[in-house]
From Swiss-Prot:
The gene is grpE. Pfam families: GrpE. Residues 201-211 have a biased composition (Polar residues). InterPro entries: GrpE, GrpE_coiled_coil, GrpE_head. Residues 27-36 have a biased composition (Acidic residues). Homodimer. This is Protein GrpE. Participates actively in the response to hyperosmotic and heat shock by preventing the aggregation of stress-denatured proteins, in association with DnaK and GrpE. It is the nucleotide exchange factor for DnaK and may function as a thermosensor. Unfolded proteins bind initially to DnaJ; upon interaction with the DnaJ-bound protein, DnaK hydrolyzes its bound ATP, resulting in the formation of a stable complex. GrpE releases ADP from DnaK; ATP binding to DnaK triggers the release of the substrate protein, thus completing the reaction cycle. The lineage of its organism: Bacteria, Pseudomonadati, Pseudomonadota, Alphaproteobacteria, Hyphomicrobiales.
């Protein structure tokens, strides 16, 4: 090989100085700083997502707080209401202990006393009802262990089996909870009861007397 072949020609310098424009653009793109507008957009999207999450959490907290306050208000009276129902039961027992003859032919003083006791009972139950305590309408309903407590069974083929025939002590609810179940006697031996349309028995006015 001669010395001429070893020496780089003029074209070699040009080749070394030549840079591919596409490659140069890629290198510039890699080294270029991020677009501030895109950074702001990404930051704004992140802040918006955090705000929406925080707003949802605050709304859930507000709903829970309102529900807790409502429940506390409704059920804080449960113990007091239960005690008042015991007083009402005693008034009812006192009235039922009076013979019918005395009620019919009793003296004016006795009749006035009976009317006073009945008025006191109605007033007490009416006051409890205004505070959310409602009487369970049990008689004639299908027995429901969630609302009724069976005390005895009565053979009766004229009504569907497990129908409440008699209420020994009225039951009550407060809000959506059972304050005390109704003590009842249920039918036995009749046809099978049809499924009830509603799982929850109705309620009636507290001013109605126990069956």
């Amino acid at each position: 090989m001669t010395d001429d072949t070893k020496k780089p020609g003029p074209d070699a310098d040009v080749a070394e100085e030549f840079v591919d424009p596409a490659q140069a653009g890629e290198e510039q793109a890699e080294t270029a700083e991020p677009d501030p507008v895109e950074l702001l957009k990404a930051e704004n999207a992140d802040l918006r997502d955090k705000f929406l999450r925080l707003a949802a959490e605050m709304d859930n907290l507000r709903r829970r707080t309102e529900r807790d306050v409502k429940d506390a208000k409704a059920y804080s009276l449960a113990g007091f209401a239960r005690d008042m129902l015991a007083v009402s039961d005693n008034l009812r027992r006192a009235l039922e202990a009076i013979p019918d003859e005395l009620k019919t032919n009793g003296e004016a003083g006795l009749n006035g006393l009976i009317e006073g006791v009945e008025m006191t009972e109605r007033s007490m139950l009416s006051t409890l009802e205004r505070h959310g305590v409602k009487k369970i309408d049990a008689e004639g309903q299908k027995f429901d262990p969630n609302f009724h407590q069976a005390m005895f069974e009565v053979p009766n083929t004229a009504v569907p089996n497990n129908t409440v025939l008699q209420v020994i002590q009225a039951g009550f609810t407060i809000g959506d909870r059972v304050l005390r179940p109704a003590m009842v006697g249920v039918a036995k031996g009749g046809p099978k009861a049809e499924p009830s349309a509603s799982a929850e028995p109705g309620t009636s006015s507290l001013n109605e007397k126990d069956a």
